[in-house]
Swiss-Prot record:
D-mannose/D-glucose-binding lectin. Also binds derivatives of glucose and mannose such as more complex glycans. Coiled coil: none annotated. This is Mannose-specific lectin alpha chain. Binds one manganese (or another transition metal) ion and one calcium ion. The metal ions are essential for the saccharide-binding and cell-agglutinating activities. The beta and gamma chains are produced by partial proteolytic processing of the lectin alpha chain by an asparaginyl endopeptidase. InterPro entries: ConA-like_dom_sf (IPR013320), Lectin_LegA_CS (IPR000985), Lectin_legB_Mn/Ca_BS (IPR019825), Legume_lectin_dom (IPR001220), Leguminous_Lectin (IPR050258). Homotetramer. Belongs to the leguminous lectin family. It comes from Cymbosema roseum. Keywords: Calcium, Lectin, Manganese, Mannose-binding, Metal-binding. Gene3D superfamilies: 2.60.120.200. A carbohydrate binds at Y12, L99, Y100, R228. It holds the Pfam family Lectin_legB.
Length: 237
């Protein structure tokens, strides 16, 4: 199975797999059962911003999700990613729908990673930024139902021609280039990711959520991972 570290913006509480009984932000380390969660006041039809950061000195992974004009939600978890992830990874966004559904629209996405070694400052820095997404993106690997639309948005899950979200959908977008996330000689390894998103739903209970994830470079969508597994894990263990 893939090695996955993820931040989930989980819109639907699947209490049978350990979710709290409300929409939440969670940090997932190699399992859909989050290590840390915080209640998320999800606002459908409004653009939100998610910011994820990590550095190897504090060994803390933090996510902040906010909507303009309202308070933000923060979740963090202390973890040494050197012990979890391979040295080279890919970073991506995933989303799913299930019985209930929602649009999982990404409007922008940026990422910066830095490795500081004693010898050369920032010798290994990687940065990318999408303010809009082209129709046939050369710099993204689209998996499952993920597509880019004529408005320059990334639709992670299936929408009809009229823009209505479809159920039982799973899609992911990964940056094409592998990222050197850590190395043994690095003094500091850090990364920051930011994406803006829009979730809309005709259902009173939208589902299932969006994630930012880091995985081994040959990662693929596990079969049967739509709905509560958020396109990341083959099972709920």
């Amino acid at each position: 199975a893939d090695t996955i570290v993820a931040v989930e913006l989980d819109s639907y509480p699947n209490t049978d797999i350990g979710d709290p009984s409300y929409p939440h932000i969670g940090i997932d380390i190699k399992s859909i059962r989050s290590k840390s969660t915080a209640r998320w006041n999800m606002q459908t039809g409004k653009v939100g911003t998610a910011h994820i950061s990590y550095n190897s000195v504090a060994k803390r992974l933090t996510a902040v999700v906010s909507y303009s004009g309202s308070s933000s939600t923060t979740v963090s978890y202390d973890v040494d990613l050197n012990n979890v992830l391979p040295e080279w990874v890919r970073v991506g966004l995933s989303a799913t729908t299930g019985l209930y559904k929602e649009t999982n629209t990404i409007l922008s996405w940026s990422f910066t990673s830095k490795l500081k070694t004693n010898s050369i400052a920032d010798a290994n820095a990687l940065h990318f930024s999408f303010h809009q997404f082209t129709q046939n993106p050369k710099d993204l690997i689209l998996q499952g139902d993920a597509t880019t639309d004529s408005d320059g948005n990334l639709e992670l899950t299936k929408v009809s021609s009229s823009g209505s979200p479809q159920g039982s959908s799973v899609g992911r977008a990964l940056f094409y280039a592998p990222v050197h996330i850590w190395e043994s000689s690095a003094v500091v390894a850090s990364f920051d990711a930011t994406f803006t998103f829009l979730i809309k739903s005709p259902d009173s209970e939208p589902a299932d959520g969006i994630t930012f994830f880091i995985a081994n470079t040959d990662t693929s969508i596990p079969s049967g991972s739509s709905g509560r597994l958020l396109g990341l894990f083959p099972d709920a263990n």
